[in-house]
A protein has these predicted regions:
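Non-heme di-metal
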Residues: 2-347
C-alpha cells in the first residue's frame, strides 16, 4: 500500500504544483513552450487549431494546460501567466473548436425534465465501466480507472464552485449546501478529494495532484476539460448546472457497482469508503439538484433551459466516449491508459 504523502489533496505540501505534461502535437507543444518561456513564443492561430481534432489528444492537452493555470498551475510556470492575454486568445480558439463540435454532435432533449428523467434510466445492456468492474473487473482495472479519474477527482468539487456567484436564491443555497458536503462539512479529512487520495493510496497509486495526466487519453481530458470550460464562462452557467445534475444523478448506481468491485477484489476499506460515501451522499443530492438547483435556476432564468439541456447532453456524450474507450480496451485485455502503471498486475 502506498503511504499518503502530505502533498496529496490536503496537508502542508498540498499546494505543490504538478509537472508540465509532455506535448501531444504542434498546438500543445506551442502552448507548453510559452509556459516554459522557451522557443519563439508564437502561439497557434485559427488555421493551426482548425487542423486539430475537436476531441483529440493535441487540442485537449492544450486546453488542459490552459485550464490548470486556474487551479494549481505547473511547476516552473509563473503564476502571472494565468491571465496572459496571448494564452487566453489561444484558449478561446481551442474552446470555440471544442464547443462547435459539441453543439453539432449532441442532441439535447427539448425538455429539461425529460432530460433529467432519462438520467434515471439504467441502460439495459449493462456495458459501462462500472458494470465491467462489478462483474469481471480485476485489481488492475480498478487501479487504471482510479488513475484516470484522478485527473479531476483530486479537485472533485472545485469547477462547480464557479457557478455559485452566478446563481440566485434557491439555486445558490442548494448548490452551496451540496458543495458543503463535497468539502467534508467543515472536516478536511472528510473532503471527497481527500477520500479519493486515500482510495488511490490503498490501490498503491501515487495520490499527488496531476500525477497521472500523462497516462490519461483525450477522452478523459475532454470530459475533465468540459467542466472547466463551463465553469469559466458565465454565459455557460446553465450548462454547468446541467453537468452537475448528470454527475449527482448518475453517481449513486455507478458508485454502488464500483463499491461492490472493491469488495470483491479486496481493495481495502479506504477504497470502499470513497464509493460508499457517494452511494449515500449523492442519492440525497440528486433530488436537491433537480428540485432546487435546476428548478431554482429555471425559475429565475427560464431562458437558460436549452443550456441546461445542452450541458446534460454534452456531459453524457463525452462520458459515453470515455466509457467506450476504457471498456473496449479492457475487453481486448489491454490497458486503457496511454502509459502503463508501475507495479500494476499485467493485463
Amino acid at each position: 500500500m502506498t503511504l499518503l504523502p502530505t502533498n496529496a489533496a490536503t496537508g502542508p505540501g498540498a499546494a505543490r504544483a504538478p509537472e508540465l505534461p509532455e506535448a501531444r502535437g504542434e498546438v500543445s507543444q506551442a502552448l507548453r513552450s510559452r509556459l516554459l518561456g522557451a522557443g519563439s513564443g508564437q502561439l497557434p492561430g485559427p488555421a493551426e487549431i482548425a487542423r486539430c481534432s475537436p476531441y483529440g489528444e493535441d487540442l485537449h492537452l492544450a486546453l488542459h494546460l490552459c485550464y490548470e493555470l486556474h487551479y494549481r498551475g505547473f511547476s516552473g510556470v509563473p503564476d502571472t501567466l494565468e491571465w496572459d492575454h496571448r494564452l487566453l486568445e489561444a484558449r478561446a480558439l481551442l474552446e470555440h473548436r471544442f464547443e462547435s463540435a459539441l453543439r453539432h454532435d449532441c442532441t439535447p432533449l427539448p425538455d429539461v425534465g425529460e432530460a433529467l428523467d432519462a438520467l434515471l434510466v439504467e441502460p439495459a445492456d449493462g456495458t459501462g465501466v462500472s458494470d465491467f468492474l462489478m462483474s469481471r473487473g480485476e485489481s488492475w482495472h480498478l487501479r487504471e480507472y482510479a488513475a484516470l479519474r484522478s485527473v479531476h477527482q483530486l479537485r472533485e468539487a472545485d469547477p462547480h464552485l464557479w457557478v455559485v456567484p452566478r446563481l440566485l436564491g434557491r439555486a445558490k443555497a442548494a448548490m452551496v449546501a451540496i458543495e458543503y458536503d463535497e468539502y467534508g462539512c467543515g472536516r478536511p479529512e472528510r473532503m471527497h478529494s481527500r477520500l479519493y487520495a486515500e482510495l488511490m493510496a490503498a490501490l498503491d497509486l501515487d495520490p499527488s495532484y496531476g500525477r497521472y495526466t500523462e497516462a490519461a487519453g483525450a477522452e478523459l481530458l475532454a470530459a475533465s476539460n468540459l467542466m472547466s470550460f463551463f465553469g469559466l464562462h458565465r454565459r455557460l452557467r446553465g450548462a454547468l448546472v446541467g453537468h452537475f445534475a448528470v454527475l449527482e444523478t448518475t453517481s449513486p448506481p455507478a458508485a454502488s457497482r464500483i463499491a461492490a468491485a472493491t469488495r470483491r477484489t479486496g481493495a481495502g476499506p479506504a477504497a470502499e469508503r470513497y464509493y460508499d460515501e457517494h452511494v449515500e451522499a449523492d442519492a440525497v443530492h440528486e433530488q436537491l439538484v433537480r428540485r432546487e438547483v435546476v428548478g431554482g435556476l429555471l425559475e429565475d432564468e427560464p431562458a437558460l433551459a436549452p443550456e441546461v439541456a445542452f450541458g446534460i447532453a454534452a456531459t453524457c456524450f463525452l462520458e459515453d466516449r470515455l466509457g467506450s474507450r476504457v471498456v473496449d480496451a479492457w475487453a481486448r485485455g489491454e490497458s486503457a491508459l496511454r502509459t502503463p502503471l508501475s507495479h500494476a498486475a499485467a493485463p
